[in-house]
Amino acid sequence: CGILGLGGVGHMGVKAFGLHVTVISSSDKFVVDVAASNLDK
């Protein structure tokens, strides 16, 4: 299973499926957003 995009619906999908998340981003701000969403980094 894969989810492209972690904003809005993507974030809800990750939580609903209890998926392992790998985040690839050039922005440190995005990593902070993931941490604030109670998702594993």
Curated annotation (Swiss-Prot):
| Functional pathway | Aromatic compound metabolism; phenylpropanoid biosynthesis
What cofactor does its activity depend on? Answer: Zn(2+)
TM spans (from-to): none
Q: State one molecular function term (GO).
A: coniferyl-alcohol dehydrogenase activity
Listed under catalytic activity are: (E)-cinnamyl alcohol + NADP(+) = (E)-cinnamaldehyde + NADPH + H(+); (E)-coniferol + NADP(+) = (E)-coniferaldehyde + NADPH + H(+); (E)-sinapyl alcohol + NADP(+) = (E)-sinapaldehyde + NADPH + H(+); (E)-4-coumaroyl alcohol + NADP(+) = (E)-4-coumaraldehyde + NADPH + H(+)
Q: Which UniProt keywords apply?
A: Lignin biosynthesis, Metal-binding, NADP, Oxidoreductase, Zinc
Cofactor stoichiometry and binding?
Answer: Binds 2 Zn(2+) ions per subunit.
Q: What sections of the sequence does the record tag as coiled-coil?
A: none
GO aspect biological process, one term: lignin biosynthetic process
The family database entries (Gene3D superfamilies) matched by this protein are listed as: NAD(P)-binding Rossmann-like Domain
Record-stated family: Belongs to the zinc-containing alcohol dehydrogenase family.
Q: What does this protein do?
A: Involved in lignin biosynthesis. Catalyzes the final step specific for the production of lignin monomers, like coniferyl alcohol, sinapyl alcohol and 4-coumaryl alcohol.
Q: Protein name, please? A: Probable cinnamyl alcohol dehydrogenase 2
Source species of the chain: Pseudotsuga menziesii (Douglas-fir)
